[in-house]
Amino acid sequence: MNYATFFSGAGIGCHGLKINGFDCILSNEYLEERIAIQRFNEKCDDEERYIVGDIREPETRKKIESILKQSKDNEGLDVLIATPPCQGISLANHKKTPTEIVRNSLILESILLTKKYQPKYFIYENVLGFLNSACSDSDGYDRGVKEVIDRHLKKNYYIERFIFNLKHFSIPSSRTRTVVVGIRKDLDKHPLSIYPKPEKIVTLKESIGHLKSLKKPREIDPDDSLHFYRPYDERMLPWIENTLEGQSSFDQNDKRRVPNQIIDGVLKVNEAKNGDKYKRQRWDDIGPCIHTRSDTFSSQNTIHPKDNRVFSIRELMILMSIPKTFRWVPKKTKLDTYEEIKKFELNIRKAIGESFPTRYLQLLSKNILEKHLLSQADVEAINKYFLDTQIFKKYSIELQESKPLNVELKETIEKCIFYNRLEKKSANPLKVCIGNNYKETKADIIFSTRKIDNKIPILELEKFYLYQLIDKKNLSLF
């Protein structure tokens, strides 16, 4: 199968499709230094398929349309992926200017290409507030992104959209994202059938605890040149060396060990505007959300749980599920010294911070390749069953061993349970229902581990009831 990807960055997310054998027929990215990384990984088999430039510029658009038209005239486009820039969309920017609204229309370009070339599948990924963000539509009116997607694509596509934290898919860092999946209606497959099922949450200790401890600035692991101790101003060492796991330097009582500066001979403590700055991470927690400035203590959640340093590039790669074989430099380039590494380091860190984790699109694209996906009617029947039964209210019966189920059906049920817990409220994308309760936060989507009287986790009990009761229904999949 083939795919086209827009706003593709360094190709980190869509590398998951390459792993599964998909052919990249087109990769569009604005920055040449990001496309260069894609070339190092041989993302496309033809140089002309790398298109550098603004998708809105006539010359860039002409090249894109030429490739997509050729594909449509031949075997057709299988998958279209779009991950437009999130500046002007992020919840950090509450008040959007007309310029930002136009910038948000970058997603419109992807929507219109989807509409024109009719790929079998489309995948849009963006930040938490993506769906409700204002976007200039093709008729000149400003609409929410969700409405624009439905207006142009709902006629020909089954569409699902969810907001969730990618840590639920064994990606060892916290990254809350909106993922929209559409499947062309003639395929008669429901989008939920290709969304990955939730997996084990992985802690920092489990993911990077095996790597060599680094004690000195510029120290490089002799077995892995991307695992190194990034140097910093030695005056900062007292600020972090006594900081405990989960603690910020600003939590210390000794002012000399709090980030400070000397002004006219007087020590002045820096203002602690953000509790995530100068913060040491915890081994037993999920890894932090990786940002573009992972090179400095003053950015968010960048300090190693044990060593007095920021995370190395290898550690960042693991936290973003980027495989060890992924290349950042040409094959002939040797990264034997820190001086050589330094030439590429910031570009690599920025590329990682901008990216979508490789593993999620690897899981999703693997599901696309499955031949026996559940149909729209099948999944609607399961979802209807959730509504028809009192499954979330029955907590009094004793747990018994459930009846064995077909593996495909079992996984679909698990996905239905997981994704049905994400209540999609147009007025509040941050709300996540846990039974009749919800927690709300700007920083993360919280999934409760609330227990009931018999100490069985609610998720397990929900599975049990569904397994027991679903056999009594005359659903199409039986």
Give the residues covered by each predicted segment.
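Short loop/turn motifs at secondary-structure junctions
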Residues: 2, 21-23, 46, 76, ...
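SAM cofactor-binding core of SAM-dependent methyltransferases
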Residues: 4, 8-12, 16-56
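C-terminal target-recognition/interaction regions appended to catalytic cores
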Residues: 235-478
